[in-house]
Amino acid sequence: GFVIPYGDCPLDQDMLGERVYMDILNRARKYVHIMTPYLILDGETETALKFAAERGVEVVLLLPGIPDKEVPYALAKTHYPSLLASGIQIYEYTPGFVHAKVFVSDDREAVVGTINLDYRSLYHHFECATYLYKAGCIPQIEDDFQATLAKCRQVTKETVRRESFKVKMTGYLMKAIAPLM
């Protein structure tokens, strides 16, 4: 297999972190499992996630159930209704704050690094990650994802409906400035 470290720089136009994530989403056949502390999506990334699920790929998002920052937490929840409607499974980690940034797909490829699934990481920050293709450690990355998933609660349409008014309003009001977050 291959293990390829890479860096992403906001000073060029390459957007390597986003391209790697989009490539994994677009080529997935069986599953894409994603663990990220922040979920503030642009239209292109949200469309890629939804398209993967709609073509039969199991897309699972694992996010914090306990936030470190209220506004990004509320913003993430604004995406839940449309993601759930497309068949994406969303889980929230209940024991604490999950800070891992992991993509793993089809027992074939994975990314582990510093790149969150949000505007700041994808467009504004210096980030780094490691892309793994057919590397021997990919099953262990998936095992870790599954072990973490076992400590999560699943988000449903009912969960979204019962979310507090404060969280809903915070998320939708802040959506206008989401690209800055």
Report residues per predicted region.
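Charged, low-complexity intrinsically disordered terminal segments
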Residues: 1-181
